[in-house]
Amino acid sequence: MARPLPILGGILLSFSPPAEATVQYSIIPEPSRTELKQETAKTLQLLSDQEVPTLGTDAYRLTVTPQGAHLASGGREGRIYGLATLRQLLDQLAGQPEGIPCGIITDKPRYPWRGLMVDPARHFIPAADLKKFVDMMAYYKFNRLHLHLTDNQGWRLPVPGYPKLKSVASRREESFGDGIPHEGMYTKQELKELVAYCAARGIEVIPEIDMPGHNQALHAAYPEFFCFPKPDMNVRTTAGNSKELVCPQKPEVWKFYASVFNELKDIFPSGIVHLGGDEAPTELWEKCPLCREARTRAAMKDEQEQMKAFFEKTAALLAKNGQTPQFWYEGNAGIYHPGETVYAWRQDQALQSIEKTKKAGLNLIMASSEYCYLDFPQIQGQRNWGWMKTTTLQKCYDLDPAFGKPEKEAGHIRGVHAPVWAERLPDLNHLLYRAYPRACAIAEAGWSPMGVRSWENFRRKLADHRQF
């Protein structure tokens, strides 16, 4: 007996399609293999739904006949993806009463990791809105939702024993001088419900607790965690970073992070904790008497060795819980350990990151900002911080996560990841407007083999998805 189709979202796009006469499937991301038949199907009733383990856990085969559809899947993930394809065909059929071609779709993802990141730290996203965002992700076969829960502008994770995270760190006076207070924090129950909602749609949730920097909101709540406490510190109201890093020589810092990781373990079953690790200026560590004494005692030559020691201690805390770390890759491979996973994000450094991480024995997720940062302007004239490149839909589509490298040089690449940073995205509508349709291009970059990808065909499909 086939189970009901999951409830998934639609999308509104705006652009002109290329001229195209032949009726084809409009599936995004493009399947690995499609065989079209001469017959036409005017119904897509699911006639059979079978598990065929030999296909592979995340693979499926969907056969469209004049009488209806037959789904074979290798496992739970493959079934979810097959149903997502069937949902897209149902939407296509709704706009084509004359029918769609019969055929056989044999499909599996190119990469195991296909993620989007949202940024509730900068602008809080209510849990109900996150679920709407997740529906869109499932429609396009994304399988990782990355929650950037903490930053200079807000802290969104409740931690027992630390009430000022809610009363202080989750609130700011305004955003960019607008005079409007902003606040928000998830409850533990909301996050657990989100995890379950995502799991039902084949999506794993990855929490991020940024450290040792990007912590001005934490400093406002608990200044004693920092090298030079500033009791008058406020949660940041603009974009940008601060110089404040948590002090690794203070026991209360490690007690706090142990509590944070315990809470994450109870909420997020993935066991993965993204630790940030990016944009952490060490000048205050250099000046801090406690840090200087620790470097002398351990014969550390500089603050970068102290950074390595910081993350070694953090990783040890995680290991006690059976958790594993991930990081934004900063190019210094010496900070990370073989087998760990990093995200290549820095602009114009993708090839360099592929080569360095391969030599260091690291797993790499491609999130290169000039292709994958969906908060970047889509067209000239949209809001720009000055350093952002205009990232058009075609630029996103042009991404090959391996950059043409053979398997022996790029086999450590686990997939693709597109962040949607939210300094200027105050609500779900703004978030979706920035993310789509470019997220559709990222979905295809992560799922479809290069040999079946075509920009012109992608444009044709998007025109149909506008009607969905």
Ranges and model annotations:
Residues 6-14:
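Bacterial N-terminal signal peptides
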Residues 236-237, 242-339, 347-350, 354:
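Active-site neighborhood of glycoside hydrolase catalytic domains
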Residues 109, 153-200, 215-255, 283-305:
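Aromatic- and acidic-residue-enriched carbohydrate-binding clefts of CAZyme catalytic domains
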Residues 19-111, 419, 430, 446-468:
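Contiguous, structured surface segment used for ligand recognition
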Residues 75, 116, 137, 205, ...:
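Conserved, mostly hydrophobic/aromatic
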Residues 102-125, 132, 138-140:
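An acidic-aromatic substrate-binding cleft motif
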Residues 131-152:
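Catalytic domains of carbohydrate-active enzymes, especially glycoside hydrolases
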Residues 325-330, 335-340, 344-468:
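Flexible, acidic glycine-rich loops studded with aromatic residues
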